[in-house]
A protein has these predicted regions:
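Polytopic transmembrane helical bundles with strong interfacial aromatic enrichment
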Residues: 1-458
Length: 458
């Protein structure tokens, strides 16, 4: 049925493991900062609702963090097992960057995570708050180093090639490569949006079940307040990222747009929908808006976007995949904006309690951030092909020399283990989210909240 060689199986295996892994950091990055905000608000106001939410979401964070660490370690091993050609060629750059992540971010998280999770009643409130902030900083620093490495693979600079391997000459240029600032901002905002959607969906779920206490209202209010700021900001950052990609990876943009040929000097249309055909070099059944592609991508009606046929066939990314992955990401972004606008309109007077249609929509949008992150990752990585280091090393030259049989067996083992272990972990997470924040507190603390007059306060 499938005539895949070892190279394709290695790509599928890496895509599978990374797709699993990226889910967990996308949640923990935002949740860590959310926990820091909750604890800071509690220390300032002494409103026990903030403590209630902190203790609840810290459990969600802990499970996500654990699964993220495990899946990340497995992914890192594949650089040596399946992609030894890449490790030999570019290891002098990617190796130190990953080491910096371990020496800074991971050590910071590991050093303070225990205090954060188990030290609420064992250390002073300021020290505990400091530990939470350090964990949040650690998650962001991890994002910094990982994206520095990945961005260098997208827009490499600050190196020379000696004896067939990469040698760094300017570490600042390596780290702060042309695409890094945009990709870091885009991913960080995406992680915060993903966490906000999860918080909103959890609050909406419990509101639908008839639970309308202060914790539920606070989750909805804080999550929607963050979304109304971050979703429009993400649109702006995404536009800037697109312009950067057009400058340094024009073939990727042409593939994303499904744009195969320019017509004379006419401005480039925006293809909304269609079916890209790489063999026929056209997008079939397309629905397009004239000139809008030029306006969005060049901010001008006089310029054209490079077409895919302007690049050699062996240098073209697969338009069929990135065309639709980008539209999934963008379409979900529009739905997120709708949720943010609708929710903040209802936020005045907390009118979402009697709006079951909105609450159901919010629950359905809960996992949309994760789907959008995955779609964006596919757009970025598939759009980089056929290069592993853009314009420098081809992916086919980076793979190890394994045969089809061992790659097939290892892929099957990964699928079974990942689906089993992370399936159970995900089931446990959903179970905790359904139980709600009240279960994170002992009965006497819940009684204290009711007696404090904060039950109906958002």
């Amino acid at each position: 049925m499938f005539d895949w060689d070892a190279f394709m199986l290695a790509r599928i295996q890496f895509a599978f493991t990374v797709s699993f892994h990226i889910i967990f950091p996308s949640i923990t990055i935002g949740l860590a900062s959310y926990l820091a905000v909750l604890e800071g608000c509690y220390l300032k106001t002494r409103n026990p609702v903030y403590k209630q939410l902190y203790l609840f979401w810290s459990k969600i964070f802990a499970v996500n963090f654990g699964m993220g660490v495990v899946s990340g370690l497995v992914m890192a091993f594949q650089f040596g097992t399946n992609w030894s050609g890449f490790s030999e060629f570019a290891g002098s750059i990617t190796g130190p960057l990953l080491t910096y992540e371990v020496m800074t971010a991971f050590f910071l998280e590991a050093g303070f995570l225990g205090v954060m999770l188990f030290g609420w009643n064992k250390v002073g409130p300021r020290l505990h708050f400091f530990a939470t902030c350090m964990v949040a900083l650690g998650t962001f620093m991890s994002t910094f180093w990982i994206l520095a490495s990945n961005s260098w693979m997208q827009t490499p600079q600050g190196y020379i090639i000696e004896n067939g391997v990469v040698v760094p000459t300017d570490w600042l240029a390596v780290i702060f490569n042309p695409s890094f600032p945009y990709r870091l901002a885009h991913m960080a905002i995406a992680a915060f949006i993903t966490s906000a959607l999860l918080v909103v969906a959890t609050g909406a779920w419990h509101a639908l079940k008839g639970k309308r206490d202060a914790a539920v209202n606070k989750m909805l209010s804080m999550g929607l307040g963050l979304l109304i700021v971050l979703v429009p900001l993400q649109v702006l950052v995404g536009d800037m990222h697109g312009l950067n990609t057009l400058k340094y990876q024009p073939a990727k943009i042409a593939a994303v747009e499904g744009h195969f040929k320019n017509e004379g000097n006419e401005p480039t249309p925006l293809i909304l929908f269609g079916i890209p055909d790489m063999e026929a070099e056209e997008t079939k059944y397309k629905v397009e808006i004239p000139a809008l592609g030029s306006l969005i991508l060049t901010h001008s009606l006089d310029k054209q976007v490079p077409a895919l046929t302007e690049f050699a066939k062996e240098d073209r990314p697969n338009s069929t995949i990135v065309f639709w992955s980008f539209r999934i990401m963008a379409g979900l972004g529009m739905l997120m904006l709708l949720l943010a606008l609708w929710g903040n309109w209802l936020r005045r007077g907390q009118r979402w309690g009697n709006k079951p249609l909105f609450l159901r929509f919010a629950v359905l949008m809960g996992p949309s951030g994760l789907v959008a992150v995955l779609a964006g990752w596919f757009t970025t990585e598939v759009g980089r092909q056929p290069w592993v280091v853009y314009g420098v090393q081809r992916t086919v030259d980076a793979v190890s020399g394994h045969g089809v049989l061992p790659m097939t067996i290892s892929l099957a083992v990964f699928i079974v283990i990942y689906c089993s272990v992370f399936g159970v972990g995900t089931y446990y997470l959903i179970h905790m989210l359904k139980k709600g924040p009240d279960d994170a507190l002992p009965p006497e603390t819940t009684d204290m909240i009711a007696a404090s007059g904060h039950v109906n306060v958002a």
